[in-house]
């Protein structure tokens, strides 16, 4: 009988440890080693100005990305938008809204032969009738520093403090192969420490820039 009790206690202890580990993982920021997954040795690094947090980047061959099912796309998008609040960077619209990009293959810097960006801008509130806007554009070549892109407000603004979510897709070609690297970032006009609970409704909505 005593042996059975000890076995039961051991099982309960192991289950408790496993559950605690699961909670710790589920409510922790995405670890660095999972923030940038590559393919064919091709890697894109992205930096959001004024924010030291690294985005969560997933890189695909273009043909593989196009072949993803809706469920696979949903899982990928859920990954790049972060595991917990504060897990991904936020572009500061009132402080120089820039993103910077560099590329490498086999751990050596490379310059893509072709490059463009596609942004899916998701309105934060329910008021905006257009929930998602799609923006396609070119990136600025910064020479040896890579490429940059300046964002702007893409959704309709109803309150003093504004926030929206962007899923960026960078389309580029390296050694004749087409790739897509995608990541998520927020962007808003609030300074550090801004409380959105103290927001104020604007007299009239402000249209996207």
Question: What spans do the regions from the language model cover?
Answer:
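Short, surface-exposed loop motifs enriched in S/T, G, D/E and P with embedded aromatic residues
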Residues: 41-43, 129-143
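Short, aromatic- and glycine-rich surface loops/edge beta-strands on solvent-exposed regions
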Residues: 159-175
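Short, solvent-exposed, Trp/other aromatic-anchored flexible loops in extracytoplasmic proteins
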Residues: 91-109, 138-163
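N-terminal export/targeting and maturation segments
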Residues: 21-81, 152, 182
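Mature extracytoplasmic domains of secretory-pathway proteins
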Residues: 61-135
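N-terminal Sec-pathway targeting helices
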Residues: 1-16
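Short beta-strand elements
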Residues: 30, 103, 175-209
């Amino acid at each position: 009988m005593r042996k059975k009790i000890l076995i039961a206690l051991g099982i309960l202890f192991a289950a408790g440890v496993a559950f605690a580990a699961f909670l710790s993982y589920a409510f922790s920021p995405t670890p660095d080693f999972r923030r940038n997954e590559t393919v064919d040795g091709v890697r894109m690094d992205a930096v959001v100005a004024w924010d030291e947090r690294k985005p969560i980047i997933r890189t695909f061959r273009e043909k593989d990305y196009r072949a993803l099912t809706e469920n696979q796309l949903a899982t990928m998008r859920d990954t790049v938008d972060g595991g917990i609040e504060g897990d991904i960077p936020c572009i500061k619209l009132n402080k120089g809204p820039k993103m910077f990009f560099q590329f490498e293959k086999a751990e050596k810097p490379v310059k893509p032969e072709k490059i463009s960006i596609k942004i899916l801008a998701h309105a934060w509130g329910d008021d905006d009738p257009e929930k998602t806007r799609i923006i396609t554009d070119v990136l600025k070549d910064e020479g040896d520093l890579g490429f940059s892109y300046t964002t702007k407000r893409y959704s309709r603004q109803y309150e003093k403090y504004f926030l929206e979510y962007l899923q960026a897709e960078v389309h580029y070609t390296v050694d004749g192969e087409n790739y897509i690297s995608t990541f998520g970032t927020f962007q808003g006009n609030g300074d550090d420490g801004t409380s959105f609970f103290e927001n104020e409704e604007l007299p009239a909505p402000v249209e996207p820039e």
